[in-house]
């Protein structure tokens, strides 16, 4: 990866030297890592079900987690079921649907549930509306909906208007813009809060947070990491709150491979906590 691919967005604002290709040694041994998936660990495809994380990258993630006491989680707009399918055979802590569902290091799940009537009626309205917008697709996530227009960008404005109408009707819902997608999710759920929740728990607590993301949905995560004195990394172009930038998914892969080769395998540690029960939270 060329030196310019890994840079600080503040380098032009002061006299600091552009960062090297790996994190500073004094930080790398005590970090908690958070990664978005689509557009960060995996190339974006025309349809969500075409996305694949290379096996070598999954192995890099597993090794990075092992090197850092398992303090590594995936933070995504996808459901946890999808994330598990994309990262098998490994099982990482997860935050899915922009933080509306979360699985901690123990396997305990924290889920925001919408009233069934909202899921049913909102889903029916969205399905009927998208039938009239050729090329758009509706992805149902239980407590959330994704309106994709990558194949029909001319319908972006119509989908935004539709999503705004849905969120006005049901104030428990909020609109989230993304890359060629408009999402409707439980109000108050975001990636920043998910990262903050992980940072209060073992093995993440007390570590320096590092978050890689590529989309508008990742900005709340960057803000939380910045406030904690961590390292926020924007993948790709565009304005951002992140303080570092990698140019592409492939540069993330190269960073993972380089970081793996520069660290020694530590002794295994057990960060699980006993005596937990799964629970869900309703709004």
Question: Language model features by range: what are they?
Answer:
Residues 3-6, 11-16, 28, 54, ...:
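Mg2+-dependent phosphoryl-transfer enzymes with acidic/Ser/Thr/Gly-rich catalytic loops
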Residues 79-95, 155-174:
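Substrate-recognition/cap helix-loop segment adjacent to the acidic, metal-dependent catalytic center
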Residues 24-47, 74, 195:
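Asp-based phosphoryl-transfer active-site loop
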Residues 52-141:
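Active-site phosphate-binding/coordination module
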Residues 97, 103-124, 176-206:
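Substrate-recognition "cap/lid" segment bordering the active-site pocket of phosphatases
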Residues 39, 94, 147, 195, ...:
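Residue-level signal for inorganic ion chemistry
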Residues 136-153, 174-185:
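Charged, glycine-interspersed solvent-exposed loop segments at helix/strand-loop junctions
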């Amino acid at each position: 990866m060329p030196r310019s691919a890994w840079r600080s967005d503040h380098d032009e604002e002061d006299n600091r030297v552009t960062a090297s290709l790996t994190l500073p040694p004094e930080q790398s041994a005590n970090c908690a890592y958070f990664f978005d998936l689509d557009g960060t660990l995996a190339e974006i495809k025309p349809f969500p079900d075409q996305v694949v994380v290379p096996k070598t990258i999954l192995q890099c993630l597993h090794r990075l987690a092992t090197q850092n006491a398992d303090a590594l989680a995936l933070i995504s707009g996808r459901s946890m079921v999808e994330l598990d399918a994309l990262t098998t055979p490994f099982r990482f802590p997860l935050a899915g649907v922009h933080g509306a569902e979360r699985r901690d290091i123990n396997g305990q799940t924290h889920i925001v549930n919408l009233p069934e009537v909202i899921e049913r009626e909102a889903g029916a309205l969205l399905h009927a509306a998208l039938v009239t917008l050729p090329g758009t697709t509706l992805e149902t996530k239980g407590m959330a909906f994704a309106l994709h227009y990558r194949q029909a960008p001319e319908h972006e404005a119509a989908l935004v208007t539709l999503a705004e109408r849905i969120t006005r009707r049901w104030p428990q819902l909020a609109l989230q813009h993304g890359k060629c997608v408009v999402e409707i999710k439980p109000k108050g759920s975001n990636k920043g809060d998910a990262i903050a929740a992980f940072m209060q728990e073992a093995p993440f607590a007390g570590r320096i947070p590092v978050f890689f993301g590529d989309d508008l949905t990742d900005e709340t995560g960057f803000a939380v990491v910045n406030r904690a004195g961590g390292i926020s990394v924007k993948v790709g172009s565009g304005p951002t709150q992140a303080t570092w930038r990698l140019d592409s998914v492939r540069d993330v892969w190269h960073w993972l491979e380089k970081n793996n080769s520069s660290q020694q395998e530590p002794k295994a540690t057990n960060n699980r906590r006993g005596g937990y029960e799964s629970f869900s939270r309703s709004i």
